[in-house]
Amino acid sequence: MFNVKKATNDCIQWIRDWREENGPGCNLIVGISGGVDSLVAAELCVEAIGADKVLGVIMPNREQDDIDVAYDICQYVLGIDYLTINVGSAYDNIIDQMDLAFNVTDQTLINLAPRLRMATLYGVSQSHNGRVVNTCNLSEDYIGYSTRYGDAA
């Protein structure tokens, strides 16, 4: 039978071990969307190394109706510091420049924002002695519905 407590403790220990091997003393950088995947990943990180070593990054694309959920998760659920970096203007500027050069496909419109979030996470990570945390779930990994080096870090 599946033992949730053991699986949770195994994940927490894995995070501690991975951090020790890949960046002793580093911070863990988590993209916080307000969804379950980023919440669980961030909570495991907090349990593993403490809230003071976990930094949330909230990255709306222009306006986001449910952005308060992400803020509440950081402030009241996790107790972590967070940054808000709106990727909307970068998204708009890149799309405008692409439109000048070629016809932008719907796939490009869909996938650009997650890729901008990925680059943002790595920029934050590099500036905060951090490592980017994978917030994908197994089903997303299995079907390939993730952003390489982004939520699939």
Locate each region found by the language model:
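Gly/Ser/Thr-rich active-site loops/lids in small-molecule metabolic enzymes
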Residues: 150-153
